[in-house]
Regions:
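Intrinsic-disorder/low-complexity coil detector
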Residues: 35, 50-51, 60-62, 87, ...
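Catalytic cores and adjacent binding grooves of peptidoglycan-active enzymes
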Residues: 67-199
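Active-site acidic/histidine clusters and adjacent loop/turn architecture
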Residues: 1-54
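Active-site-adjacent substructure of cysteine-protease-like catalytic cores
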Residues: 46-75
Length: 199
């Protein structure tokens, strides 16, 4: 078995990394992203992408979150994130519980939902419904406990302020149609900003 060396990493980067361009934003990433990004951008020709792409991040050397020995797809340049502020990664079960309650969405349906248009509607519904008046009217013990936890409340307030799935839905659909995997469709944790090459 070959031993990994710094030279291997340098060779991988030299062989696979190129300058990517997406809606006027530039980022280094894997050469296999060129075609799907171009295809998605061409699919948007004549449309106004709203909200516009304000952040495009790709190559970030780091392990997969929660691990120390497995490189993330970002470390390999095979994944990118778009507009993270309004498209967060949601991992905490309590966040899903409150989002479901505030929007009247079935919790299990929310976790399993893969349709960008439906998730975008849930995002807007949460922004509209998660208010002080709604929070003060809650009586369910798990919801109350979540709302009283400072860290949880700060995250929820951020979701209400910025949204959870605010990317232009036709753009998400175009990126998926171009063969990319969307993190917003994952059932265990949703990463609405995240797109990656299929393995």
């Amino acid at each position: 078995m070959a031993k990994a060396t710094a030279f291997d990493a340098a060779e991988y980067l030299d062989t696979n990394m190129v300058r990517l361009t997406f809606f006027g934003r530039h980022q280094d990433g894997h050469r296999d992203l060129v075609a799907p990004l171009r295809q998605a951008e061409e699919a948007m020709a004549g449309q106004t992408v709203s909200p516009p792409i304000t952040s495009f991040g790709c190559l970030v050397p780091r392990p997969i979150r929660g691990t120390t020995n497995r490189l993330s797809n970002h470390a390999l340049g095979r994944a990118f994130d778009l507009n993270p502020t309004g498209n967060p990664r949601i991992t905490q079960a309590v966040d899903y519980l409150v989002i479901a309650a505030a929007t009247g969405t079935d919790l299990h349906q929310l976790r399993r939902e893969t349709d960008p248009a439906t998730l975008s509607r849930i995002s807007r519904a949460f922004q509209d419904s998660f208010t002080e008046a709604w929070a003060s009217s809650q009586t369910e013990p798990n919801i109350l406990a979540a709302l009283q936890n400072r860290g949880v409340r700060e995250r929820l307030n951020g979701y209400a302020r910025h949204g959870i799935c605010t990317l232009y839905v036709p753009l998400i659909q175009a990126l998926i149609a171009a063969g990319l995997v969307w993190g917003g469709a994952w059932p265990s944790s949703k990463d609405f900003m995240h797109f990656e090459l299929r393995r």
